Regions:
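N-terminal membrane-anchoring alpha-helices
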Residues: 1-91
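Mobile, glycine- and charge-enriched loop segments
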Residues: 74-109, 221-241
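Beta-strand-turn-beta hairpins that frame and shape the catalytic cleft
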Residues: 85-98, 187, 194-207, 232-238, ...
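Membrane-embedded segments
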Residues: 94-188
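Active-site neighborhood of phospho(di)ester-bond hydrolases with catalytic His/Asp-centered motifs
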Residues: 100-101, 126-132, 157-164, 190-193, ...
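Solvent-exposed loop/turn segments at secondary-structure junctions
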Residues: 104-105, 133-136, 164-168, 195-197, ...
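Binuclear metal-dependent hydrolase catalytic cores centered on His/Asp/Glu-rich metal-binding motifs
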Residues: 173-187, 199-241, 247-249, 312-315
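Conserved beta-sheet core of the metallophosphoesterase superfamily
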Residues: 244-323
Length: 328
């Protein structure tokens, strides 16, 4: 019994070894757990996260700003020819019209040599102007535009209307010689007037309406349009107005087949998949800021994005336009 007691109280070496083994296993597990915990990554301090975010934002803004500036610069030195096709009921032979508007003293090449060369290569039958070749507030020196007119008049007959910037020079700066200078440079200026041209044995009537839609009843435009409406002795009638909203507000009540306008600079900013952003007449997301439209009288209205811009509102994602209209 004494031996049994001693055996129970003091286990044999095998039992001691078993107990130690169990104890050692637990210690090993405990050691692994402690070691794993010591290798865990420490959390990034909040100030570093804020700094990294700011650096990324600055980099993105720099890239965006650079792309924006590049786009603005491109739109000041490049333009595209936009081609339009319309059908006339009476023309016996097709004709081509080149429409320029809103140049705002801009030059493409020395003395606009690039623009003149492109117009010449298009071989137009008529060259029509939509106004705003000058810029009000930048003096009365527009000799470069007069030189352009002289060069264009050597290619084809040139006629057109004045824009709001010419009107402001004429009335506010008292530049009463403006119309005379345009005329001397080869432009037939239409101020609520008609001009007629014979192209390939077809008579083409050009109507030029002056001012803005608000002026229609006050300064002779309404009287002029009423006076020419009964005429039928022409093969094609084109109506010019600087402001495009003139057409849906007033002019679509009269007979013509093609309307041409500018003024909007294509909405200044053109948003992808949305279109023009803003015009003075229509506000945000305008309806008439560039492209082709069908009016209530079934005439086609073409609103050119124009060839220039004012220094206060540069174009963004909005390439200037030289309009080419083929009529058959």
């Amino acid at each position: 019994m004494c031996c049994a007691l001693l055996y129970a109280t003091f286990p044999g070496r095998k039992d001691v070894a078993f107990i130690k083994a169990k104890h050692g296993k637990g210690a090993a597990q405990s050691g692994r757990h402690t070691h794993s915990g010591s290798c865990a990554q420490r959390a990034t301090p909040p100030w570093k996260q804020v700094l990294l975010t700011l650096l990324v934002l600055v980099a993105l803004l720099a890239l965006l700003g650079g792309a924006l500036w590049q786009n603005i610069c491109y739109n000041r030195t490049h333009y595209t020819a936009e081609f339009y096709q319309i059908h006339s009921r009476k023309l016996t032979q097709s004709c081509r019209v080149v429409f320029l508007t809103d140049l705002h003293l801009r030059e493409y090449g020395a003395d606009n040599c690039e623009l003149v060369q492109d117009v010449r290569s298009l071989a137009p039958d008529l060259i029509l102007l939509g106004g705003d070749f000058v810029t009000y507030g930048e003096g009365t020196d527009y000799d470069n535009m007069l030189s352009l007119f002289r060069q264009l008049s050597e290619i084809a007959p040139v006629c057109g209307v004045l824009g709001n910037h010419e009107d402001e020079l004429y009335f506010l700066d008292n530049d009463r010689e403006l119309v005379e200078k345009f005329t001397a440079a080869g432009v037939t200026v239409l101020r609520n007037q008609e001009a007629r041209y014979t192209v390939h044995d077809n008579v083409i009537s050009i109507l030029g309406v002056e001012g803005s839609p608000a002026d229609f009843s006050n300064y002779g435009a309404s009287t002029f349009m009423d006076s020419v409406e009964p005429q039928t002795d022409y093969d094609l009638r084109i109506c010019l107005a600087h402001v495009p909203t003139y057409f849906p507000e007033h002019l679509e009540n009269y007979s013509f087949e093609l309307g041409l306008a500018g003024h909007t600079h294509g909405g200044i900013v053109r948003l992808p998949k949305i279109g023009p952003l803003y015009t003075a007449e229509e506000g945000f997301l305008p309806d008439y800021a560039g492209g082709s439209y069908t009016l209530a009288n079934n005439a086609t209205l073409i609103v050119s994005r124009g060839l220039g811009d004012s220094s206060r509102a540069p174009r963004i994602n909005n390439v200037p336009e030289l309009s080419v209209i083929d009529i058959d």
